[in-house]
Each structure stands twice: as C-alpha cells, then as structure tokens.
Regions:
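Ligand-binding "clamshell"
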Residues: 1-6
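Residue-level "edge-of-site" marker
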Residues: 7, 70, 109
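Phosphate-binding core of ATP-grasp and ATP-grasp-like enzymes
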Residues: 10
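A bilobed periplasmic-binding-protein/Venus flytrap-type ligand-binding module shared by bacterial periplasmic
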Residues: 13-29
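Short secondary-structure transition/capping segments
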Residues: 14-16, 77-79, 116-118
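Secondary-structure end/capping motifs
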Residues: 26-104
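Conserved C-terminal helix/tail region of periplasmic/extracytoplasmic solute-binding proteins
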Residues: 97-127
Length: 127
C-alpha cells in the first residue's frame, strides 16, 4: 500500500535540496543559480498545467491519465515556497531513527538553512 503522508496530516518535506554545509560555503553562487532554475521550473509546474503534463508524459513514458493523476496529487502537497520546516525534518528523523540511531538525538533545526530561500523570496522567485 502506498500512502501519502501529507494527505494523512503527517508533516513531510515534499521538496527541497540537500547540500553539505561545506559545499554551500565554498560554492554558494552555484547553489543559488541551481535554486533559481528550480524556482523557474516550479513556477511552470504550478502555473502551466498542460505544458507540465505534456512534458512529464513524454519523459515518464506513462499515459496522460496516469501523469495527470500524479501531477494533481503532487500539486496538492507540494509547497510553492520550498522553505524547509522543522516539523517535516523531525518527521524524517523519526522515520529513520531505527536504522540510523544518530537521528534519534539529532536537532532538526541543524539541518535547515533558509538563507537561499530567503534571498530568492526577496528577489520575487517565491511568494
């Protein structure tokens, strides 16, 4: 059985990027440019349904009906602003703590850096 955690009211990070802090420090401009491109793609995804479904259908190799269903489901749960939330990271850590014992004592906030999302929000990429 496949469950949609957001549909069950369970906080879950639906989108976002994971980058080591050391990489971010030395390659911040690359990460910012990548996130700008991601923001542009997200805008197309949310604002141009037909174009998005056509592209997804082509590259996923699924029927249009299946692709549209997946599109509609993801759109319900995905945030237009990919700002990570402490609650969603906490849920992830809870989910992996059995196989990753360090997760049980990890501080969810230590995994979050919103500086790039904040910058792109000021630039108008996210609302």
């Amino acid at each position: 059985m496949l469950l949609a955690l957001p549909g069950l009211g369970i906080p879950w990070q639906q989108n976002g990027e994971l980058v080591p802090q050391s990489y971010l420090k030395t390659n911040r401009d690359n990460v910012v440019r990548f996130m700008r491109a991601t923001a542009e793609a997200m805008k197309i995804y949310f604002d141009q349904k037909e174009k998005t479904i056509d592209c997804m259908t082509e590259y996923l190799g699924r029927s249009r009906e299946e692709t549209e269903y997946a599109y509609n489901q993801y759109k319900r749960w995905a945030d237009r602003n990919p700002r990570p939330q402490v609650e969603t990271i906490r849920t992830t850590l809870e989910a992996i703590k059995k196989n990753t014992p360090k997760a049980a004592t990890a501080n969810p906030a230590s995994f979050i850096d919103t500086s790039i999302v904040d910058q792109l929000t000021k630039e108008g990429y996210f609302k």
